[in-house]
Amino acid sequence: MSKSLNIAEIAGRYAAAWLSHDPDAILALHAPDSIFQAHGRTGEVKGNTALRQEFAQVFERYPDFGVVTHRLLVGDNHWTLDWTLTFRPSGKDQRSFRALDVVEVDAKGLVTRKDTFFDHAQVKAALAA
C-alpha cells in the first residue's frame, strides 16, 4: 500500500459525496469492482450499476439523509467511521440511528469495499416512529 495516501482526506471526500446525495459522486470514489454491504439488510452489492441503484435507494429510504460523526479511525488502507444516520420523512420530525462503517481502499485511494453495520433496534424504532 502506498504511504502517500491520506486516508483521512479520502474519508472526508467520501463523506462529502454521500452528503451531496449523488450516487454518481459516490461511485466516482469507488473502484469498478467494489463491494458494498449493509449487514443485516442486504447481501453484497457489487459493480457500478448495482451500487448506483443501492445508493439511490438509501436516499429514497432515508429522506434528507445526514451524518453525525462520532469517531473516525484511520489505517494505512482503510477507515472506520462511527456515526449516526439522520433522516426526516416528509412532514415528520428528524429521526436517527447509530451505524459503523468499515471502508477499504486500493493503492489509488478508491473504495474497494464498504461494510455498514447498524443498531437494528434503533433502525426499527426510527422507521416506526
What annotation goes with each model-predicted range?
Residues 1-32, 127-129:
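Short, low-complexity N-terminal intrinsically disordered segments enriched in polar/charged residues
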Residues 66-67, 95-101:
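Short, surface-exposed coil-to-beta transition loops
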Residues 98, 102-125:
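Short beta-strand edge/turn micro-motifs at domain boundaries
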Residues 4-5, 23-76:
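A solvent-exposed, acidic/Ser-Thr-rich amphipathic alpha-helical stretch
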Residues 30, 85-87, 101, 118:
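Short beta-strand segments enriched in hydrophobic/aromatic residues
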Residues 14, 26-27, 34, 47, ...:
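Hydrophobic pocket/interface hotspot
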Residues 76-85:
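A short hydrophobic beta-strand element
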Residues 87-96:
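Short, cysteine-centered beta-strand-loop-beta hairpins and adjacent loop/turn segments enriched
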